[in-house]
């Protein structure tokens, strides 16, 4: 098949492309590399800096459009698939829809269904937008609500979801937002991870537990990494002889990986039920995820044996307690590392995931 993957989130599309190519398909990835993370892509559509950046990008995309025709499948990472206002994306989507056979919409991150469901229906005990029945009031959550609810982004998302042949959800959280609305065409497929040639199940340092945390620019409070970082710093102060903390902020993907490499554990998103791409990549290397590991995460994967993730509730106290237990009981680390590697191999190996996508795409032909 000839497959076009548009947009990027945390290397999902590039990793999927690598798997699909291994299966013999012709794949083109068009993206901006997920901004400063600079993930690989075949065709770069980064927005130039400056006041005229939007117009320059729009001109480049219109020049590219004739090359983006005649594909068997076009998959969009998100309704905002280029760095343009939603109003500009309506005609581009319609063009790509008209000149290609089938359209797949990815439910992999921020969009109207995610914002609206978590704000109004609240099916999750906690999320980026709610803690129980209470709405979160931090600046990022409010900004996203204003950005998506009752706007052209909402209209674009609804159009693309309704018009798409299928919708693929990458995490449990997104599945519960789309499946009730589109039960017949929503398909859950786990995120793809390329397993490293060598994974480490031993301790990185015999004397100290090495804990890694990555900080996203401007999204620390929204993702809960501010709380996790505070707990980790307090524990480092208390257990300086037992723990080393590594903090990475705003790094390109290649540098992020290097800094993460020699860690025993990674602190990830506080308000998540599930591990996303960065913690899954860490787990594939034998790094323990401290973050989202709720029962629903294992249920959607039909995983009844492995429990590698140290699940935390969205509070300072929970993070502090769980991380402290790992520091005080480092004998747990080798088994959790082993389970982490097996978990990713079992559910997220990029070739296994690519075969699931291949089966879905073939069912559309």
Specify the residue positions occupied by each region the protein language model found:
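Acidic donor-binding loop of glycosyltransferase active sites
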Residues: 261-274, 287
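A short, active-site helix/loop in glycosyltransferases that binds the activated sugar's phosphate group
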Residues: 114-115, 145-186, 230, 357
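Short hydrophobic beta-strand element within catalytic cores of glycosyltransferases
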Residues: 288-295
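Acceptor-binding helix/loop patch of EC 2.4 sugar-transfer enzymes
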Residues: 39-42, 46, 105-150, 218, ...
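Membrane-proximal helix-turn-helix segments that form the acceptor-binding/catalytic region
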Residues: 65-69, 92-98, 102, 128-166
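A charged, aromatic-enriched C-terminal amphipathic alpha-helix characteristic of glycosyltransferases
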Residues: 331-362
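Conserved donor-binding/catalytic core segment of Leloir-type glycosyltransferases
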Residues: 185-223, 229
């Amino acid at each position: 098949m000839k497959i076009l993957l548009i947009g990027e989130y945390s290397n999902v599309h590039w990793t999927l492309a690598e798997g699909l190519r291994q299966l013999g398909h012709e794949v083109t990835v068009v993206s901006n590399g997920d901004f400063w993370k600079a993930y690989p892509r075949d065709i770069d559509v980064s927005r130039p800096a400056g006041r005229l950046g939007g117009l320059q990008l729009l001109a480049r995309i219109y020049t590219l459009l004739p090359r983006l025709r005649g594909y068997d499948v076009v998959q969009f990472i998100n309704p905002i698939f280029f760095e343009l206002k939603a109003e500009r994306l309506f005609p581009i989507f319609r063009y790509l829809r008209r000149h290609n056979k089938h359209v797949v919409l990815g439910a992999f991150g921020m969009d109207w269904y995610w914002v609206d469901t978590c704000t109004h229906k609240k099916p999750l005990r906690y999320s980026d937008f709610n803690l129980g029945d209470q709405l979160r009031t931090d600046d990022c959550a409010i900004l996203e609500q204003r950005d998506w609810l009752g706007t052209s982004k909402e209209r674009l998302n609804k159009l693309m979801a309704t018009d798409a042949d299928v919708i693929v959800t990458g995490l449990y959280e997104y599945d519960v937002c789309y499946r009730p609305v589109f039960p017949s065409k929503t398909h859950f497929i786990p995120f793809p991870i390329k397993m490293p040639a060598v994974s480490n199940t031993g301790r990185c340092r015999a004397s100290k537990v090495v804990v890694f945390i990555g900080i996203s620019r401007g999204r620390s409070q929204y993702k809960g990494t501010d709380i996790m970082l505070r707990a980790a710093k307090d524990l480092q102060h208390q257990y300086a002889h037992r723990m080393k903390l590594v903090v990475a902020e705003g790094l390109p993907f290649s540098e992020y990986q290097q800094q993460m490499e020699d860690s025993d554990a990674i602190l990830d998103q506080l308000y998540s039920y599930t591990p996303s791409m960065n913690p899954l990549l860490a787990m594939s290397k034998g790094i323990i995820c401290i973050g989202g590991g709720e029962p629903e995460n294992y249920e959607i994967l039909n995983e009844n044996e492995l429990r590698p993730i140290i699940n935390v509730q969205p509070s300072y106290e929970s993070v502090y307690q769980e991380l402290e237990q790992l520091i005080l009981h480092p004998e747990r680390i080798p088994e959790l590392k082993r389970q982490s590697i097996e978990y990713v191999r079992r559910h997220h190996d990029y070739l296994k995931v690519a075969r699931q996508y291949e089966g879905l795409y073939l069912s559309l032909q």
